[in-house]
Amino acid sequence: VSNYQDITNITCPDKKTVVIKLSKENVAFADYMTIGILPKHLLKGKKLATAEFNQKPVGAGPYKLISWDEGQSITLEKFDGYYAGKPHIKKIIFKIVEDSDARLLQLKSGDLDMAQIEPKQAKSLKKDSKDFDIYRMNTADYRAIAYNYAGSKLFKTYPELANILSYGIDREAIIKSALLGEGQVAYSPIQKNKFNSSDIEKFAYNPDKMEQLLQQDGWTKNKKGIYEKNGTELKFTITAMANDKVRVDMAKLCAEQLKAHGISVKAEARKELDWEKQDATIIGWGSPFDADDHTYK
């Protein structure tokens, strides 16, 4: 709702024109308007999360929903009335296959015509078969460690650790190992965005600097070789969703790198994440759009 507080007046001079007046300039407003408009006559007085409208959505795109088998598949059929012309593909079935190994098997068996696979799988597929075309997609997608500043006692007490620990993560090594080189070192959530600035601290890999900053902040190594401060060991767990093997690999690599420098870190693959209590997790996001609306709002 806060996105639209600048609106002072809305008029419709004709059936195909809407004029919106704002109280002040807002460069992000054009992106705010990309959010779909909900039909009041279908949703008034109903719970948005459970309304039938959400199970039978109607849009303005080239395809229309035919069926939805929850947790299994979504079937779309071409919409002949699409304003840009009839689609060439008559029907599209999106199969929901969370496990990457299962996706690869279904791709090989012919149950799937197309699938998003992991770099290690792409390498084996390219080696074993000439029946597949592999496409590389340039995206704004990134991975990062998200620290829990509210629910984790360690990071709630010492939030400055997030920046300090960044110097102990060798992102080049992670790209080579977990992604087989299919990626680049990230330093910002809007790195692939037109609003990005490269003139910021990039936290380049420098474990010596990390340890120096820890010591300046009052952390000292105990008899076990683990940094501690005020009786608290620098000890935490990095989680990742078990069905995302790339994130699990990344969590393990981050843990190994930090453990080599006196930080007790454990990596865990979990079926479900406890967002309120966990210390840290490997997240994925992408922000090619207006940063004010998409990342920081």
Model-derived regions, located:
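Aromatic- and charge-enriched surface segment that lines or borders ligand/interaction sites
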Residues: 1, 19, 106, 155
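Surface-exposed binding/hinge segments that line
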Residues: 2-43
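Gly/Pro-rich hinge or "lid" segments in bacterial periplasmic/extracellular proteins
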Residues: 15, 34-87, 91, 207-212
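Short, well-ordered beta-strand elements
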Residues: 18-20, 61-64, 74-75, 90-96, ...
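Ligand-site clamp/hinge motif
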Residues: 54, 79-125, 255, 264-266
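Short helices/loops that flank or line small-molecule/ion binding pockets
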Residues: 101-111, 127-129, 252-261, 271-281
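Append "and occasionally in soluble cytosolic enzymes with long acidic Gly/Pro-rich linkers
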Residues: 157-255
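Acidic-aromatic pocket-rim loops
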Residues: 272-297
